[in-house]
Amino acid sequence: MEGTFVGADGRISGYDLKLTVEQPNDLVVFAHGFMGFKDWGCWNLVQDYFVKNGLSFLKYNVSHNGVTLEQPTDFADLNAFGSNSYSKEKADLRCIITQIKDELGDQIKIHLIGHSRGGGIVILMADEFKVTSVTTWAGISDIGKRFPMGAELENWKQNGSRTILNGRTHQAMPLNYTQYLDFLENQQGLDIEGSCQKLKIPVCAIHGDADTSVELKEGHQIAEWTKTSLHIIPEANHTFGATQPWNSNFLPCQLNDVCDITIQFIHETIQL
């Protein structure tokens, strides 16, 4: 089932929901990462794989990721991308969970999964919604280190915006300085370490040891702060072998392993 929700700043975004009869009261909610979207690469296959293994699964677009309802796999709205923020992504997750609980009922137990930046977001929001479990895939452990320092930061402030190159599409992706101001103004609510230490629910942390986008060290930090073990996927990059576009009907082996670990973890959590 495809649907829409009203996210941060009233922006309408899309989601995909597939329900199972095996676990009617448990729902996986998946948050994508930076320069990602719900239909990126293998995420549709991931959703199908979870459903095949008895878990209802929802994936959604954060409201300011740059894609649109009309062009859900293209960065067609760079103004929205430039004005995104971590606080907006928190608001998006809040909006989609609230809407889904209204539609499916308050008895629904939420299991959050977040990839990369989405991993940080699901940790930050887990306590607010008293979710049942959290899983991070190559999750970030520190938001502050995502921003430039020194002269680069000062130039960003003076110019009001800077750009980064999207290596896949070759687009110059704008980042407004307001993103950094949002971080400065909301640091307490964007403290991943502090949020990890508050969690009293099962946490599963997974990371590839060949990840060059988010260091393996960040996975170790999440595991340490949540008092769990880190699942390390040998020779796996940031996306566990997935690419955009993905033209196969099968998951890459490493991402398949990630899914198997996560599915087992969630089923074990349901039995607690």
Across the structure, where does each feature detected by a protein language model lie?
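Short alpha-helix in the alpha/beta-hydrolase fold that links the catalytic acid
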Residues: 43, 201, 214-224, 245
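Short beta-strand/loop motif that positions the catalytic acidic residue
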Residues: 198-199, 205-207, 211
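Catalytic active-site module of serine/aspartate enzymes centered on a nucleophile-bearing elbow/loop
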Residues: 236, 240, 244-272
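Short, surface-exposed "cap/lid" segments of acyl-processing enzymes
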Residues: 22-66
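Active-site nucleophile elbow and catalytic-triad environment of alpha/beta-hydrolase enzymes
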Residues: 176-195
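Hydrolase active-site cap/lid region
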Residues: 128-176
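N-terminal cap/lid segment of alpha/beta-hydrolase-fold proteins
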Residues: 1-23
